[in-house]
């Protein structure tokens, strides 16, 4: 398995920010339509991360025009242009699947506050 590990290590991204479930992300995705390509931003909160290494994925959920939309991205995929962390969420679970059933203010995620002293 050491040969597979070295092949996998060559295809890992190094520009992935640290994020976890509950964080709000902007995922910039390259969309190819025929000969044209454009970057589309998908903004939502992270439901969870699965897997490890080159097979690692994360699921982002947003509500668009009253309809919940979930999209699962491979972390090390070449179609992802960049990942931006907008806010850090204060949650106590690794998987937020219960958020699918919540509506309105109940579906709000508290923002994690940073208590480091600013000097």
UniProtKB/Swiss-Prot annotation:
Q: Name one GO molecular function term.
A: structural constituent of ribosome
- In terms of domain of life, where is this protein from? Bacteria
User: Gene3D superfamilies attached here?
Assistant: 2.30.30.790
Q: Among the record's GO biological process terms, what is one?
A: translation
GO CC, one annotated term: cytosolic large ribosomal subunit
UniProt entry tagged with the keyword Transcription regulation: no
| Keyword hit for Ribonucleoprotein | yes
Q: Which InterPro entries match?
A: Ribosomal_bL19, Ribosomal_bL19_CS, Ribosomal_bL19_sf, Translation_prot_SH3-like_sf
Q: Which UniProt keywords apply?
A: Ribonucleoprotein, Ribosomal protein
Entry's PANTHER family? LARGE RIBOSOMAL SUBUNIT PROTEIN BL19M, RIBOSOMAL PROTEIN L19
Family, as annotated: Belongs to the bacterial ribosomal protein bL19 family.
This molecule's function is given as: This protein is located at the 30S-50S ribosomal subunit interface and may play a role in the structure and function of the aminoacyl-tRNA binding site.
What name has this protein been given in UniProt? Answer: Large ribosomal subunit protein bL19
Q: Which gene encodes it?
A: rplS
